[in-house]
Amino acid sequence: MKELKVSKINNGTVIDHLPPGRALKVLRLLGIDGSEGFMVLIAMNVYSKKLGGRKDIVKIENVYLSDEQTKALALIAPTATINIIRNGEVVEKRGVTLPDVVEGILTCPNSSCISRSKREPIKSKFLVVSKRPLKLKCHYCGEIIEEKEVSNYINLR
């Protein structure tokens, strides 16, 4: 039996069951580059019974994800599980859920889209056309974003 030996965190967030190779994208999404001063643990390509193969894990001490960050995480890692840790114990465990409509998280790739106009106070709005594979359609101009490119358009302010 394989055993994972990664340090525990006392307080913070564990993002588990990430598809292999996504841990670094998750850190980029969260704006974490290592200079913040809090502990970040990354395990990549470790064995997972749940996923039937490999997975990545990210542990972030003393950091908790906002609702917006959780929604963005669902766009790049729909199989992720978020564990909230307090005093060394898991106090909450939840999967991420991709909503049917994604608002204000993505930038439309179409430079002419009204949602990109600085003069219009309009949040971007994408309809989820397909969850697997992920395919999103801009509500305003109809531009399509495919799964492989979605992380390029995530814009958390």
Curated annotation (Swiss-Prot):
Q: Which UniProt keywords apply?
A: Metal-binding, Pyrimidine biosynthesis, Zinc
Q: Where is the signal peptide?
A: none
Which SUPFAM superfamilies does this chain map to? Aspartate carbamoyltransferase, Regulatory-chain, C-terminal domain, Aspartate carbamoyltransferase, Regulatory-chain, N-terminal domain
- The reply on keyword Glycoprotein is no
The record's Gene3D superfamilies line, in alphabetical order, gives: Aspartate carbamoyltransferase regulatory subunit, C-terminal domain, Aspartate carbamoyltransferase regulatory subunit, N-terminal domain
Q: Name one GO molecular function term.
A: metal ion binding
- Kindly indicate whether the keyword Metal-binding belongs to this entry: yes
Q: Which cofactor does it need?
A: Zn(2+)
The record's Pfam families line, in alphabetical order, gives: PyrI, PyrI_C
Binding locations of Zn(2+): 108, 113, 138, 141
Which note does the record give on the cofactor? Binds 1 zinc ion per subunit.
- Biological process per Gene Ontology, one example term: 'de novo' pyrimidine nucleobase biosynthetic process
A GO cellular component term found in this entry reads: aspartate carbamoyltransferase complex
Instruction: Please describe the quaternary structure of this protein.
Output: Contains catalytic and regulatory chains.
- Entry's family note: Belongs to the PyrI family.
Protein purpose: Involved in allosteric regulation of aspartate carbamoyltransferase.
User: Any idea what this protein is called?
Assistant: Aspartate carbamoyltransferase regulatory chain
Q: What is the species of this protein?
A: Ignicoccus hospitalis (strain KIN4/I / DSM 18386 / JCM 14125)
Gene for this chain: pyrI
